[in-house]
Amino acid sequence: MFDANCLKLMFVAGSQDFYHIKGDRTNALLDTLELALQSKITAFQFRQKGDLALQDPVEIKRLALECQKLCKKYGTPFIINDEVRLALELKADGVHVGQEDMAIEEVVTLCQKRLFIGLSVNTLEQALKARHLDHIAYLGVGPIFPTPSKKDAKEVVGVNLLKKIHDSGVEKPLIAIGGITTDNASKLQKFSGIAVISAITQAKDKALAVEKLLKNA
């Protein structure tokens, strides 16, 4: 079952987000995930995207299972980004899809009553369209600030779009993503939560970063 409290601090990552380290990127992901879970992130979203990501479906599934196992160990929701069929196969807690992925109606048909669904929006129109879809658990809004983590990131929408969606009567929980750091997270406190990538993966002291993000979120 979906609990909106899990949106407070969602860690989003895949092996590609450890391009800056020497050594095995998959192990770096697993080590960082366990540290983040120990530090009380409220959800984890597994996201393999881009040229540096794993390309072999067998390897992707193996890594997803390892991440899921860690999330179960700490009782934290495990969400898969975009890969709807993998999310269903692994019985993930949720799936998060974007505007260019599988049609949201098809995602709902496949996933309803099996796992919760998050949907990315980057315009007010997209949010208004999604508000009547009962099976969408939450909306991910962004990028709020400039982000180094996504090569395909849309134009920065700013905190202003979050406010517009919130004020327009959309009652679904809103989670902010894109360029969020320990310094700017406090600007987003009135919303349901934040999702971060590099704020954790590139932090020198990852446990401290999670602590600060939780305090400011």
Curated annotation (Swiss-Prot):
Pfam families to which the protein is assigned, alphabetical: TMP-TENI (PF02581)
SUPFAM superfamilies assigned to the protein according to its UniProt record, in alphabetical order: Thiamin phosphate synthase
Bound cofactor: record note: Binds 1 Mg(2+) ion per subunit.
InterPro entries linked: Aldolase_TIM (IPR013785), ThiamineP_synth_sf (IPR036206), ThiamineP_synth_TenI (IPR022998), TMP_synthase (IPR034291)
Source domain of life: Bacteria
GO CC term, one of those recorded: cytoplasm
Enzyme Commission number(s) of this protein: 2.5.1.3
Transmembrane segments: none
Catalytic activity: 2-[(2R,5Z)-2-carboxy-4-methylthiazol-5(2H)-ylidene]ethyl phosphate + 4-amino-2-methyl-5-(diphosphooxymethyl)pyrimidine + 2 H(+) = thiamine phosphate + CO2 + diphosphate; 2-(2-carboxy-4-methylthiazol-5-yl)ethyl phosphate + 4-amino-2-methyl-5-(diphosphooxymethyl)pyrimidine + 2 H(+) = thiamine phosphate + CO2 + diphosphate; 4-methyl-5-(2-phosphooxyethyl)-thiazole + 4-amino-2-methyl-5-(diphosphooxymethyl)pyrimidine + H(+) = thiamine phosphate + diphosphate
UniProt-annotated binding residues for Mg(2+): D82, D101
GO MF terms, alphabetically ordered: magnesium ion binding; thiamine-phosphate diphosphorylase activity
Binding site for 4-amino-2-methyl-5-(diphosphooxymethyl)pyrimidine: Q45, F46, R47, Q48, K49, N81, S120, K150
UniProt KW keywords: Magnesium, Metal-binding, Thiamine biosynthesis, Transferase
Residues that bind 2-[(2R,5Z)-2-carboxy-4-methylthiazol-5(2H)-ylidene]ethyl phosphate: T147, P148, S149, G179, I197, S198
Role according to the record: Condenses 4-methyl-5-(beta-hydroxyethyl)thiazole monophosphate (THZ-P) and 2-methyl-4-amino-5-hydroxymethyl pyrimidine pyrophosphate (HMP-PP) to form thiamine monophosphate (TMP).
Protein name (database record): Thiamine-phosphate synthase
Encoding gene (name): thiE
